[in-house]
Amino acid sequence: MTNNQQQPITIKISEFEGPLDLLLHLIRQNKMDIYDIPIAAITQQYLDYLHSMRALKLDIAGDYLVMAATLMTIKSRFLLPQPEPDEMDEDNEDDDPRDSLVAELLAYKVYQEAAGELREKEQARHQHFTREAMLVPADLSAPKLTAGITLDDLQAAFRQLVAKRRRVRPLTKTVVAETINIDERMTQITTQLQHQPQGLDFADLFTVSASDEMLVTTFMAVLELTKQDQVALQQAEPLSPIHLYLRQDEQHDEH
């Protein structure tokens, strides 16, 4: 006699923290170039994963479905007839539908790097005896980005850098190990700003030859310096270059 009751399925799908985590896993597993993602292949593999989840009657979080729609949209743009070079507008000449996705993936790597560093610091703290934590003052405000500059503005600037990096990077390059962490990069940036009191453009912190690790470490360092009020950001208008300055009190502290 057949037992009609379904047995509960035990499967570890929580290996991935979200759609970007899954995409990064697929890119690494297939040794794909994050700056030149074969969109048809990655879309098919991503959809195959979702189909397998459905086959096992597992719930799929909404953000996974949103990413699936995004991948399909990018794929469809590649299937459309492309304009001839002489018919392209200057503004769209270097537009690649993957740019925004690549920037999101690299930004996600930023948070992975930061989470890894926090875990290491937490483990190191467990090796020491510490006094009881003091209560946080009620009037202590959460760190914010400079007034007028939002996280979206920084991410937009980051996407522009990714697009430029993809266009101008060499086809082959010698890989040089860079082991700098976020704290060290923060020190480098503040030192650079001490020698440039007039400030510098956000884009000038990112060299074309830098590794992906340096790219995300630099981005995270800028976020941290801004949140700590060591660095001020200015932007004349939306999507215009973001300028960094060392705050006056920080400059005086160094003299």
UniProtKB/Swiss-Prot annotation:
Source domain of life: Bacteria
GO CC annotation terms, alphabetical: cytoplasm
Main location: cytoplasm
Subcellular location, record wording: Cytoplasm
Record keywords, A-Z: Cell cycle, Cell division, Chromosome partition, Cytoplasm
Function: Participates in chromosomal partition during cell division. May act via the formation of a condensin-like complex containing Smc and ScpB that pull DNA away from mid-cell into both cell halves.
Family statement: Belongs to the ScpA family.
Name of this chain's protein: Segregation and condensation protein A
Species this protein is from: Lactiplantibacillus plantarum (strain ATCC BAA-793 / NCIMB 8826 / WCFS1) (Lactobacillus plantarum)
Organismal lineage: Bacteria, Bacillati, Bacillota, Bacilli, Lactobacillales
